[in-house]
Design a protein with these regions (language model features):
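A short acidic (Asp/Glu
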Residues: 27-29, 90-94, 126-129, 153-155
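Active-site-proximal C-terminal subdomain of hydrolase catalytic domains
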Residues: 123-195
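Leucine-rich repeat
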Residues: 34, 102, 127-130
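Catalytic-core segments of thiol-dependent peptidases
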Residues: 52-124
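A domain-level signal for caspase-like cysteine endopeptidase catalytic cores
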Residues: 1-76, 114-118, 136, 140
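Conserved beta-strand elements of beta-rich interaction domains across eukaryotes
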Residues: 22-24, 86, 122, 149
Length: 195
């Protein structure tokens, strides 16, 4: 069973598509991510779709459904991925997939989107890896954190980032504002954005 939450946005024209890796999609539970998306909708009016996956096939299926069955896909500015992993991999069902494999899975499907990773995994791309991901996927930017902190969750900074993405079009301006408003947290989690 897959949880799906969709909220109506009064204030914004763009939405978030969140895909969270879980051990088993058949087991439904309300995760911290779901609670934070609910707060984001209630407090800031930013709508989201939330889905879970437990395999690379589930990730691909969710993305395909979003791309081809959701006629509002163009309105999803942020693809929010909450997945474990090491450095530049994601882990699904105890299998590790490289960033190159993920880029190829998303090939040409992320045009104009910001792909954002929660701090459940470290995002540490060199310039060549970042450019490859952006070129292959068509994404406008990829963002995440250089620190997968066990005691500091990125939810607060994620929400601030999502809100700024609604206010500003320029990714440089978004990052500057984020650092001005949340400098200590940006430094602690090593927020980074590649574009």
């Amino acid at each position: 069973m897959n949880l799906q939450y969709k909220y109506k946005s009064q204030d914004y024209d763009q939405f978030i598509f969140c895909l969270e890796a879980v051990p088993d999609v058949e087991t439904s539970s309300i995760t911290e991510v779901v609670k934070n998306l609910e707060r984001l909708a209630l407090e800031q009016g930013i709508a989201s779709i939330y889905k879970t996956c437990d395999s690379i096939e589930g990730l691909e299926e969710s993305l395909t459904i979003l791309l081809y069955d959701d006629h509002n896909f163009k309105d999803y500015e942020i693809i929010y991925l909450v997945m474990q992993g090491k450095r530049n991999t994601i882990c699904l069902n105890n299998y590790y997939y490289s960033f190159e494999e993920i880029a190829e899975l998303f090939e040409g499907k992320m045009k104009g989107k910001i792909v954002h990773f929660a701090n459940a995994k470290i995002l540490d791309l060199d310039q060549e890896e970042a450019q490859y991901f952006l070129d292959i996927t068509g994404a406008r930017a990829v963002s995440g954190y250089g620190v997968a902190h066990k005691t500091i969750n990125s939810n607060l900074l994620d929400k601030a980032f999502f809100s700024l993405c609604q206010e500003f079009d320029d990714v440089v301006e978004i990052v500057e504002e984020l650092h001005q408003k949340h400098y200590a947290l940006c430094k602690a989690l090593d927020f980074r954005l590649y574009y």
